[in-house]
Structure formats: C-alpha cells, structure tokens
Amino acid sequence: MEKKTNKNKGVAEETKKKVAATTGFIIGQFIRFISIYYAPLYVALGRPHTITILALPYLLIHLFWNTDKSFFAYDSKKLNSIRNLEISSVFLNHFILQLLNSCILPNSTLARLITIYMFRCNNKILFLTSSFFAWFIGQIFMLNSFELVLVWIRKKNYLRSTFRNYLLRNSIFVILFNCLFGSLLFILSIQCLGRIPSPIPTQKLSEVSKIEQRERERLQSEEERDVEKKKPDYKLPDSESEILQKNESETPEFEKHLAALLFDYKRWTRPFRYIKNNRLEQALRNELSQYFFDTYQSDGKNRLSFTHPISLSTFLKMMKLKIPLLLVEKTLYNPLDNGWVSRNKKQMNYRRIYFLNRVNNLDKAVALPRIQFETTRTRLCIHNDETKQEYLPENYDPLLTGPHRGRIKRGLLTINDTLTINDTLSEHLRETIILNRLHALVLLNTNSKNFNQKMYTFEKKPLEISDFSTLSSNLNLTDPDQKTEFLVNPIETHDPNFIRKYIPIEEIRKNAPRWSYKLITELEQISYYKNPPEDHDIRSRKGISVVIFDPTKEAATTNSKTNTTKDTNLETKNKSKSDEKLVVIRYPQQSDFRQGLIKDSMRTQRRKIFLQELFNANVHSPLFFDRLRIVFSFPRLKQIFINLSARHVFGILKSTDKQTKRKRTKKEEKGENKRREQKERLEIGEAWDVFPLAQIIRGLLLLTQSFIRKKIILPSLILGKNIGRILLCQIPEWSEDLQEWNRETHIKCTYNGIPLSQKKFPENWLTEGIQIKILFPFCLKPWHAYKPRTSHYDFCFLTVWGRETEQPFGHPRKTPFFFEPVLQELDKKIVNIKARIFSKVKINLFKRVSKENDFQIRKQIMNESFRQIEEIPSCTNSSLIEKMRNMSDRTRTIKKKIERMTEDKKKVTLELYISTYKRSYRLALSKTICKMVKVLIWKFSYFQKLLNQRVYNDIFLYTIYICRMTTQLFLESTKKFISKSILKNERTKKRININKETKNKIHFLSKLKTSKNCKKNLDLSCDFSNLSQAYVFYKISQTGVLNICKLISVLQHTVISFFIQTQIKDLVHTEGIFKSEVIHQKLQWPKTSQWKNWLRLNSKYDLSPIFWFSLISQKQKWRNRVTKYHRPKEKYLNKWNSHGKYRLSDYKKQNVPKSVSNQKDNSKKCYQYDLLSYKSINYEKKSASVLYRSTPKVTKGQAIYHNDNMSQNYLFAITPNIPGKIKRVDIPYIGKNLDRKYLIWKNIHFSLRKKVDIESWVAVNTSSNKDSTIGNYNYQLIDQIDKKEKELFSLPIHQNTEINRPNSTNSLVDWMGMNEQILNRPITNLELWFFPEFVWLFNVYKTKPWIIPSKILLLNSNLSEIDSQQKSETDSETDSQQKNIAETQKYLEEDSTKSDTKKETELELELFTKKYFLFQLRGDQTFNKSFFKNIQIYCLLLRLRNRKKMTLSCIQRRKLNLRIMPSMTNLLNVPEFLKRTGLVMDPLPLSIKTDGKFLLYKIVGISLVHKSKDQTNKKYRKTRIIRAVENNHLDVLVLENILSSRCRRELRTLICFNYKNWNGVNTTSIFCSKNCNLFWEERNPRQNDKRELIQKFIWPNYRLEDLACMNRYSFDTTNGSRFSILRFHMYLPRKIHG
C-alpha cells in the first residue's frame, strides 16, 4: 500500500509540474504578446532596470541550482501546491524565461513591424482579436507537437534503453550537459551585468539653476574689476526659467513616485556621450527616430510617408485639440486639393499638344520660320477668397531661390499693406504688431480655469517714450571716427538681419527637448574664478601639467637677496603675481578611450568592432576597415605573386602599377623620413609613460649619465690624448681642450624638451619626466684646427645610455671618429707615394705590352703557316686553280691580320713618342693611366698572393736551404774524414766514385747562384766539346718564358723533329712535348697524322727547369751510353716532372694564380664523368681494357715507364689511385673526407730513424739497362708499429701482399718528388729542427693533391723480401705468369707458418682490422671535452717509445684526467674490457660493389697509364693483345682508353675517316727492338677493330647525346661534368656479332 501511495504521489507531482510549466509558459507568452501592442509595457520590459530585477536573479538562481541542488532541497509533506517550492520554481522558470526573450535576444524590428501592421489595419479591434486567437492556436499546436514527439520517444523502447544506457548511466554526459548549461548561464549573466546600470545612486546632476548662479557671480566679479567698461548684465529670459519651474511644480504626484523611476526618461545615470553646447542652454535630447512615419496629402490623396518628421505630427495633434475650440463653424477643408489635380491635367494636355506640334513641324519640307516657345516655371502663389492668385516675389519664392522656413504675413499688418524698406523707423514703431495666434494657442492651457476668459482678449499696450530713448541712445555717436564711418560706409539694403528686424517674418520655431542639467569638463572646472564646482562631469583627456614659471619661488629668491626693509607695495604685487603660474599641459600620444565620456554612464556593448590582431591599440569600425594599412593587402600580395610566378603573366599589371606610381622627390623622401622618426620618438616616449616607476628610473639614469660624462669620461679623454701627444714628442693641448670642456653646459628640460635652467629642476620631474640638453657638446680631436662650428652640432640631448641625440627620444647620432683626420692624412701620403711608384712602373708596362704584341704576331704567323701545311694534303682531289685561289685567300687574310696587329702595336708604342706639349698626348696618357690603375686595382689581390708566395720562397725556403746545406756539408766532411782514416786510399777513391754515381742530391733552381754546387755545375758548361742538344735546350729554357713557348712551337714542326737526336726525343717525349708517333713517324705518310696535329694544337705542355737541370748534369753519362735502352740508375726523370713547385707553368702564369681546390674539384668531376662514360662503353665487357702497344723486353723487377705528363685540365684525366685490395673493394670515391684538400700532417707521425720500404715511391724509366740494379733504400716516413706493442687503439691498415711486393720496383707514382731527397737523407737528429721534408712534401702535394701513391697511408706490415733480379727469363708472358703464381703460393705458405705462432687474441684483432678500415665509438655516457682529450693523449702515447716520461709530464701539466682512467686493480682482456666498459668501438664496413670487379681498377689504370703503362698486378695479370704486324708496321695506341672523355668524341670523328691509313706508322719506334716479346691475337684483328669501332664511336656517341639532353632538361646545366648525377641507362649496349 505504501508503494502505491508513493506512486500516486509521484504521478500527482508530475502532473502538477506539467500544469505549472504550461501555465507559466502561456502566461509569459501572453504578456509578451500584449507588450507588442502596448508600447509602455514593451518599453518597460526592455529597460535596463528590468534586467536588473528579473534577468540577473533568474540567471544566478539557475546557476546555483545546477551546481548545487542541495541548496534548494526542501522536504515538505504539505499538499498545498503553492507552498511547494519546486512547483513554484517551475512556474517562475517558464514565466520569466518568456519575459526575458526580448532582453536576452533583443529584436528591434519586431516593434516596428507591429506598429506598421496596427497602422495599416482600419479595424484595430478585429486585428487584435484575430491575432490573439492565431497566437493561441499556434501555442497549443506547438505544445501538442512537442508532446507527441516525446510520447513517441517513450513508446520506442530501444530509444529509451539507449538513452538510459549511454546517457543517463554514463555520468560524463550528465556532467558535460550541466557544465555547458551552467557556463552558458554564467556568460549570459555577465553580459547582462555589463548592460545593466548600477543600482547604487550616483552623484547629483549639476542643475541649471546652479550653473546660472555661477555665471552671474562671475559676471558680477568682472563688472567690479572693470569699472570703466560698463557691460550690460546678460540674463536668461524669464520665460525659460519660469517654464521649467512651473513644469516642476505642476508635475503630478504619480510621476514623482519611486516606482516611476524605473521608467523615467532621465534615468538614474547619464547618457554615454554629451552634446556640448557653448551657450547657456542645456544639451539637446536626441530622441528622434528616422523610422517614424505618418500620413500627408499629396495630389489630393492621403499617402504614407516613412520619413515624416515627428515634430510635425505632434504639432498637428496639438492643433487638432485646440482649433475646434476657436473655429467650430469651419471645417478642415483644403481647397488646393482639387486645383492640384486639375493643374496636373492641364499640364499633361499642354505637353501632348506641344509634342504633336513639334512632330508636325518636322514632317514639313518647307523651311519654317523661327518658332519662339515660352518657358514655363512653377511659381508659388497666395490664394485667398478675397484676393486672386498673387505670385510671391522672386527673392522669397522657394521654388526659384531655394527653401525658406517662413512666410510673409502681410494680412497681419494693420496700418499699411505697402510698406517698403525705405520707410522711416519711427513709422514702424508707431504701429502695433499683432501677436501670432498659433503662439497663443500653444501657450494656452486648456486645463486652466481662465482659458475661456483669455480666449479673445489680447493685451495691447501703447508705446512709451522710453522706447524711443533706447533708440536714440543707440544712435549717439560721440567719437569722430564713428561719425565718419557712419556717413561714409555704404548701407546694405539687402541685409538679412535688417530684414528680420523690421519686416514681420514669423519663423516656425520649436523648443527642442533638452536635458535639465548641464555638464562641465575639467578645463571648465579650472576656469571658474570663484566657487568652482566640486567635481567635473565629463572626462577630459589625460594630461600632465608642467609648471614653466612660478612667480612665488622667484619672489622668495629676490626677497632673500634684497634687504628686508622694502615697501609693502612690493609684497602686495608679489601676492598678486603668486596666482599667475604659467602651466603647460602635456598630453601623451597614446589613445584615450575615456575621453569625452560622462562619469558613471552606462557603457555600450561594442558588437560591431573589427579586431584585426590579438591586441589592438586603437578600435576600428568595419566602415573604415578599408582605410587601414593591412599587412596582407591586395597590392602587396600581387607584388609577391608577381615575383613568384612567371613575369609575362602579370606584365601588364606591373606596367600599369609602375605608370601610376608617382615619382618621389628628395623632399618627399625627407618628409617621410622625418615623419617616421617622429613616430618612433613618440612611441618611445609613450613607452616610458606606461609604467609607473619608469620616469623615476629614467630621470636618475640621465642625471648619473650627465655626471659621468662631465666629470669622469671627458677629463679622462683629455688626459689620455695629451699624454699621447707628449709621448709622440708633440705639443700638448691642455688649454684648448679644457676651454671646450668648460664650454659644454647641461640644462634641465621638461619632458617635451623645453629648457628651464641649468640648476633648477622642473616640478614633479620624477613622475612627469625630464630631459637633459647639452649646449656646445665636447668633441675630442687629435689636433685643433680652425673650423667654423655648424649650428647642427651646437646642442644635443642626452640619452639613458649616455649618447647624443638631436631630438628627445631620437636616434643616437654618429660622433666623429678620433683617428679620422689622422687616417685622412695617411691616405693623402699613400696616394702621393702610389703616384710616384706608378709613374715609374708605367714605362715598364708599355714595354711589356709591346713585347707581348710581338710575340702574338709571331705565334699567329707560325700557327697559320702550320695550318696551311696541314691542310694542303686535303686538296689533292681539287684542281690546280682552286688550290691557287685558296693559297691566295689565305695569304691575304694573314697579311690583313699582320697589318691589324702592327697597327695595334703602334697605338700602344707610339704614345711614348708623342710630344708632351700636345693635348692629345695628355688625354691619351690620362686614359692609359686610368686603365692601368683599374687593372692594378682589379689585380691587387693577385699581387698580394704573389707577394706572399715570393716572401715564402725567398726567405723561408732560403733559410731552410742554407741550414740544410750546412748540415749536409758538415756530415759529408765528417764521413770523408772517417773513411779516409779507416780504409786505404784506393778503396776510398772507389767509394767516392760510387757515391757520386748513386747519390741523389736535391737539386734546386735557387736564385742563390753563388753557392758552391751551382758553381761546379756551371763550370762544366765551359767545355764546348761536351756540349750536346740537351745542354742547348737547357740554355734556351733559361732565357725566359717567351722563348720556351717559341721552342715548343718550333719543336712541334714535322720537319724539325727529324734533326733532333733520338735520346733527346725520348727524354722530351717523357715531358709530353713529343709523342712516340710524332717522333718516329715516316716522312712520306703525313696524311695519316691529322689527329696528331689536333693533339698538338689542343695540348699544353709543362717543361720544368729542374728537368733540364738534371739533363745538363748528366750530359757526360749520356754520351757513354751503350744501348738506347740504357738508363742511369740514379736519375729518375719522372720525379722532376712530378714536382709542381718549380714547373715552368708557374713562371709562365704568374699573374693567374691557380686554386688547388678548383683543381681538386675539376679532377673529381672529370673522374666521375669518365666512370659513367666507361660504364656506358664497356658495360658487357668483363675483361681489362684493350691496349695496343709494343712491349719491350725488360728485366725481372723492372717497370716500363712511359710519361705523358699532361695537365689534367686539357687532355689527360688523372684520377686517384686506390689503395688496398682491388679485387675485394670497388669504391668509386669515398665521400667521407671530400673537403680535405691537402694531407693533414697531424694525423701521421714522421720519423726517419726507422726504415721502411719506399721502393713504391721510385719510378723507373722505359729505357733501363739490363745490368742496372736497383737497391732498397729503406727509410721510414711513418712510424712502424711493432706487433708486440699492438693494443686496443693501434690500427694497422693491411695491404695485399700479393699485389705489391716490398722488393718490387713496380711503382706507379713518384709521390711528391721526394725520393731523391729522402733516399740520400742522413740519419741525424737535426731533421726535426728544420723540417725540410715537410716543406718539400707539402709544396709538391699542394700542386697535385689528387695523386696518391699506392703505399703512402699504409703502415709497414713486415713483409718478406724477394730478390729483385732472377736468373731465368722466359720468352713468353704465359711462362712468367705461371712463375708469378708459384711465387705467390710460396709467399702465402710462409705467411701461414708465421701466423701460426701468433696468439688467438692478436689474430682476431688483426682479422678485425683487416676486414674493416673505419671505426666509430659509442658509449652509454655523455662524453665531455676532457674525455676526448684523454683519448687523443692515449693515442699519442701509444706511438711513443718513452711513454712513462710523457705520461708523467701530462699528469703534471694536468692534461690527463685520472678520474676518467679505469682502475688497474682488475686486469682484463680486451673482450672482457669491452663488455664491462661503456665505451665500444663499432666497425663501419666500407661500401663493396659486387657488379664489375675490375671496373675501378680499369679506370684508375687508364688515368694513370702514363705512369704505369705496362705494369700490372701480379695476381691478376692479363695478356696484352697485340695486333698483327705486317711489313714492319705496328698499330698505334688506342687513345679511347688514354684520353679524357671530353676529348674522345672529337677524336673519334677525326679517326673514323682516316681508319684505313693506320698501317702508315713507322715501325722504328723506341719501344720496338730485338728484345721485344710480341703476343699474337688468336682472332682476326680486323674483325675486332670493326667491333671496337662500332662500340666505342657510334653507339656511345648517340648514347651520351641522350644523356646530355636529359641533363640539360632536368638539371638546367650544359656542363658535361654533371653526368655523374645520372645513374640510369637509356638503352642497353648492342651486341654486334661478326
């Protein structure tokens, strides 16, 4: 039963809540509906005080209700529903929410629409009833529809289940819903709080009576002061004050009730803005609306006007109430209505007739006379019953002259209707003016009792004599000046003021609604002399008053100085002056939004303000948004888009913009700069005003800066300058500097920069700010010279940082530099010295130019003659006449060129012989001097580099050379003395002879020709019987650069080469001047050498003077040569040519210094391009490159040398040699240290005490003697790491023992040209003093950084030695290969026996280091700099012998950190150490390519073919394929594998047309002899040649062209070196069978 009762109670409560909600909703909607039709209720609901009473409590209650429901928990067991708080809250909730609909969501158009509908409906009661029923039906329909939807949801169980399961049970949704609803209510409550006025009563308004009283008191005080000047007392008319008092007294009691304060138009608070009125009247109340509408008659019909003035409608309503009382018998009828319609009809008929007449006249063919049409104008007329229509005068007709608010009332004048302006004033004054009836009607109060009595009675007072007295008093002219002005000046007849006074024109006036109070500003409050108001009402702009002049302080100072006995009159004067203070108001530039606002006024909600940024200093309206300077404006975006996109698309827009842009003059630019600077200064000043304590800090800083400047800095500068002058033996300038220092004065100024005085501070300077102005600022100068000081530098302002500015808060100006005049004097002297030097150098430069012109003429003649000789054989098929023509044309062209070059030479040389008195000479000389100066300025950097290089060569190397020679002579003398004392005389003589033959001294072309060795070598040249062609060549080479070039051009001639000795040809051939084909070619086959001529023209040759010096030193030995294959054992000609320091090209190109980095980059690019081209050519060819060359028979262990030493930039591409195992590793280039240009000597520790094999450094010539033996000159450049001392950080890089034997002299490169220097180097301790080998190696390595020897960076591996010569020699190369394989097997067996003795740990470490070359360190800790420093010191200690001493010294110097070092208590093995410690070395395996095992080896061999022509690795020796020899003819070398890839295409085109003439080469080559072993090819050589021709010329030609096109398209380059980027293949190479 209890459960049933609870259920029934719950159902009853739910029904009661539903009923309460529906009733509250309907009642609220009903009141809202009534408020639409009843204006007072609508206004009451929209007032801000209703928001304070209804909205704010409602929202706050809901906010607390949703947050804490226990606050409203109320358990009541009573059945009365009214007392139940929940039901009443539901009712109020729905009721108040409907009333607040207009407050929360206000809609201004709703009220306007309702009033329009009410106005349009004639039957308003029917409209109200119909609209009410429609509203009621709509409300019911809406409620029912909501109920149906809710019932349908309840019936659907799955919707209820989902709602309960997911929403109600899940507390997150409930919390979110409550939070959202609560936050929304909170936002609405805050918005309402911003809109509502504060219910606290504010200060009382300044009423009009108080203002009038203050004004009267002020005027009375002025009259008392100025007694002489009598002024009338200005009083307000009694009418306005009486009306206001009457209105206040007659207001009903209902309006004074407290409840009416909510709806009072005056409000509790004041309006937002105040319309200031300069008169004594109050401010207007702006309550007119532009949307007011009313009816008016137009064309006899009532029409609706939406812009009808509200004042006119109110006036008509007032008239309707009062006119029936006056004129009851008359009805309101407008007789002009019918006339308006009839007049419009007449106008239409007249226009129709007029148009028809014009059309008829146009149709007539006869010439009509001139028709005069009358012009009609609408005029305003007066229409009465008594008088007919009379037009107004033109001056007063508004249809002609414009609108006039007034009308002439002639009927109201009683005496005479035709009064004119010329009538006398007395006649006007006699007549009485009838009062305006409308005015009387408006003033009448219908509610008063005396209304009927005053209906028709108008008071008429007669004129009095006093009126005329006032007129006569006004016309009294006492001054003679006034009389003359009154008589002479003309009188204006059309004066509007005169017309207004004496012509009775009544204007329609209306007393506008005004506020009952008058507000004042702060300035008006200050302006009151007596009884000023307590506070101002309107906020004025924030300003700071700065007192400029205070007479009280000056009076106090004057009184203290003067005697005390003075008159009291002075004291009274001082008192009167004490009130007169000069004050200047300083306004900040920052925006003040409170300016002009009324205190305690309600702020408006700024809904239509556009916010551009996060913080806006100024508020902008959307109306003026287009005038703002926006960052992302259209013209700026267009400019950016033009720069990014194609120029031709927006070319028209850009051109139009340029045309429309105005050219800025210098004045405009200066003005813009000034405005910009002024803006910046104002911003800085405002920044100091923002913070409260900023002005105090700034003022104190300025005072400290002025004290430091005046008392510390400037005296110290003066002291330092004069002490310096005394030290430089110059006269000090104490008096001048002190005079200028005393002249500088610091004046305190206001914040705006107005100067006050030197000692006094402005008032409130700590809060308002201060400036310090410096008059005649001190400027330190090195010496005093008379210069008039400009006014620009007479004053400045001091900044916070102690610098000078021209204006307050301006940019600091540049102070003159102290050493500027000193530098100017030095510049003048330097210019004079340069002029003297250049005048001397001028003549030498002219001479050089003349010599160069001579050389160019001769060289061009020689080249032209050679071209003629070369091109003659091509004309064999032509006729004799054509040959003669060609010859004549060529001779003409050569003659013309010679003439031009001689004229150019004359232009240069004849300028020296022109007379100095001619003007042309002076002009030409000035032009040449200017050109020379420009060239010298351009080449100044090159001159500087050459100067540094000369200093290095002449001083540093000179000292090294002297020290080395002295030590060498000393050691040689000691050796000779010891050898003489020990051995016998005969053995000593033999030893000396042997030493002379085997010794390799370092030969320098030094400039010190006075040395002993140079004298000995030069004395040998006096014997003319010993002269040879080599000595002649050497002497010619010593004459100069130009003669060497001539020598090359002469030697390259085909005829002269036959008269040179064969030995000289071989030696010159090694330097690249001659090729083997050119030297030993047949004379009767010149047409087979077209490509040789091309090579000769395109190649540049380097002839080193050291090379020729070696030739002349060995001229005796060359004459005693037995066979032509003999080669002196000591001298290796390659090393002189590889030396790049003393090459002839360095002397030839002194003005064009080379950059080693460019050479390295070019070599790398060339190498990459060669690799790509070689891959494309020999893609399927797995064997080595085919080389066609004669192989001479050589001894075992001797290399065949062939030197084609050409510069890598011209013909031959020199690529780096790759160390290590070539079979195992295939690395095109390791990109780890690409930026390293030179060898880093810090990475290698040099010592010459130990020995290591350096036979790989020594190069052997092709013409070597059988009996010549090459010894092992074992000196070590790199420290050897013993196997016993190998530890964790030792890193030996192993090489393949089978490829490079230690005893084999198969060297590829004479590295750095330092073999002779190091082989004959004595083992002494003096080498570390001078480091001669460092200088030598470094200089040579700089010239050719890309050439690396095969064993320079490989540590010694203690390889076993093999004898250099063997007894048995084989006749074929196959037998030698078998023997080499057997030797390698033996060597491997020996290595295996040695390796068995090693420990297991050492073997693992060696295998680890053999497999990997690079390591990286990783650890579990962050490494500091000290940790890496310790590692560097450990590595250094591992290389040293005396480690203990070095460790102790490092510990003493605190370079080793003992905390980082591990403790030595537990000795661990290497693997255990690596496991336990955090530092681990991880190997980095090198990149290994499996495709193409010999690809890299082939490329390197091709690029170094001039170094190792016939040398191959012993393990991978390949048979050389030699073509068939027929009739002692041998094919030449295939240049496809020698030349650089850039020259191959041009060479193929020349060879392909001369392919059949290859058999015309001479067989008497230096490489062909009886001792040569020839290897025959098993296949037919001609078929192979065809295949190679097609593969190497035709197919790669097209293929590389495709790659070039792709390269240009994809990478926008035309350089062939970029081909290394393209790693893809367009086509596969074709297989040609045949």
Swiss-Prot record:
InterPro entries xref list: TIC214 (IPR008896)
Membrane-protein topology: Multi-pass membrane protein
Gene Ontology CC: chloroplast inner membrane
Keyword Membrane attached: yes
GO biological process: protein transport
Compartmental location: Plastid, Chloroplast inner membrane
Entry annotated with the keyword Transmembrane helix: yes
Biased composition (Basic and acidic residues): 1386-1395
Ranges that cross the membrane: 25-45, 53-73, 94-116, 133-153, 172-192
Keywords for the protein's UniProt record, in alphabetical order: Chloroplast, Membrane, Plastid, Plastid inner membrane, Protein transport, Transmembrane, Transmembrane helix, Transport
Region Disordered, annotated ranges: 216-242, 1365-1395
Family the UniProt entry places it in: Belongs to the TIC214 family.
Physiological role: Involved in protein precursor import into chloroplasts. May be part of an intermediate translocation complex acting as a protein-conducting channel at the inner envelope.
PANTHER family reported for this sequence: PROTEIN TIC 214, PROTEIN TIC 214-RELATED
Subunit structure: Part of the Tic complex.
Protein name per Swiss-Prot or TrEMBL: Protein TIC 214
Gene: TIC214
